Amino acid sequence: MLMPKKVKHRKQMKGRMSGTPQRGVSLAFGDYGLQATECGWLDSRQIEAARIAMNRYIKRGGKIWIRIFPDKPLTAKPAETRMGKGKGSPDSWVCVIKPGRILYEMEGVTEEVAREAFRLAAHKLPIPTKFTSRKDANEG
């Protein structure tokens, strides 16, 4: 699973997901991309599940870039524990996603293959996404 090697603070506040991202909204590496249309949290397991779904479909056909990284710790208290007694221990890692953020990029495959691979990956994610390409970015 994706997670930071070392962090300054073990626990973080929840925070808010308002606004649009400052960077990561345009294709940087590949020809096709999967772009988020709403905000949300992506768990490291969800990021990995989507990556595996894409890799299984394209086999050895192209290259995939993961443009997001889970750097926010989520805490959880043990089961059947009474309320209070402090914040729980770090349980998993999430990535804060804002609308417009590019999640994955791909190159070396046809557009039809990329569309289908991203469709399979989108089923593994809890946020709505859309397909983007360099061709669309140049026209718009």
Curated annotation (Swiss-Prot):
GO terms for molecular function: rRNA binding; structural constituent of ribosome; tRNA binding. Belongs to the universal ribosomal protein uL16 family. GO terms for biological process: translation. CDD domains: Ribosomal_L16_L10e. Residues 1-20 are annotated as: Disordered. Coiled coil: none annotated. Keywords: Ribonucleoprotein, Ribosomal protein, RNA-binding, rRNA-binding, tRNA-binding. PANTHER family: 50S/60S RIBOSOMAL PROTEIN L16, LARGE RIBOSOMAL SUBUNIT PROTEIN UL16M. Binds 23S rRNA and is also seen to make contacts with the A and possibly P site tRNAs. This is Large ribosomal subunit protein uL16. InterPro entries: Ribosomal_uL16 (IPR047873), Ribosomal_uL16_bact-type (IPR000114), Ribosomal_uL16_CS (IPR020798), Ribosomal_uL16_dom (IPR016180), Ribosomal_uL16_sf (IPR036920). PROSITE patterns: RIBOSOMAL_L16_1, RIBOSOMAL_L16_2. Residues 1-14 have a biased composition (Basic residues). It comes from Geotalea daltonii (strain DSM 22248 / JCM 15807 / FRC-32). Pfam families: Ribosomal_L16.
